[in-house]
């Protein structure tokens, strides 16, 4: 790719190809992931914004706190260069993913926490940077997490903890979320 964001997305495409076993005997396709890549290509941001160091997995579970103040940031294996919105959207999406899981299991979760507009406004007030193209970056976060969840599910199949589904899209734990995002009905 010719920009840090293009390289980032191309890296995710390569990870997807590896995850699905491209070229191997057990190769399969995930239509939901491929539809999301197509959506991202079709809606690519006109202005990607400035390039910064992206944490990659910035979320509450990867921070250490002392007296309610963050003192350490953990889990840097997804670090890269790219727009700030990569981290903003990842934090919002991952919280929403776990919120949806909590509700699915009849738990209240924290529905008023890390809401997209609140996070964007707080980020702007603290940094002076206005988050742009947040819908695009949230879709990209959902895609990235979908590929990670696919790989996690594949390991469960490999170790005999579950069967390989007839529909590979079922490997994506939040498939319904991505479908609703693609339809414009999730947020």
Regions found by a protein language model. Give the residues of each.
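All-alpha amphipathic helical-bundle segments outside canonical DNA-binding/catalytic cores
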Residues: 129-141
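Short amphipathic alpha-helical segments and their helix-coil junctions
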Residues: 73, 115-129, 173-179
């Amino acid at each position: 790719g010719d920009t840090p964001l293009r390289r980032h997305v191309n890296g995710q495409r390569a990870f997807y190809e590896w995850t699905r076993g491209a070229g191997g005997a057990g190769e399969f396709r995930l239509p939901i992931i491929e539809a999301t890549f197509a959506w991202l290509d079709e809606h690519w941001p006109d202005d990607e914004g400035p390039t910064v160091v992206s944490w990659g997995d910035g979320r509450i579970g990867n921070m250490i706190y002392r007296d309610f103040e963050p003192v350490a940031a953990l889990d840097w294996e997804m670090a890269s260069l790219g727009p700030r919105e990569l981290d903003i959207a990842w934090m919002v999406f991952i919280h929403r993913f776990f919120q949806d899981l909590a509700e699915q299991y009849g738990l209240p979760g924290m529905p008023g926490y890390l809401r997209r507009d609140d996070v964007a406004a707080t980020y702007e007030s603290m940094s002076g940077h206005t988050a742009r193209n947040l819908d695009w970056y949230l879709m990209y976060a959902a895609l990235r997490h979908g590929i990670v969840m696919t790989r996690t599910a594949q390991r469960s199949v490999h170790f005999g903890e579950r069967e390989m589904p007839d529909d590979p899209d079922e490997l994506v734990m939040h498939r319904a979320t991505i479908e609703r995002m693609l339809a414009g009905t999730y947020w």
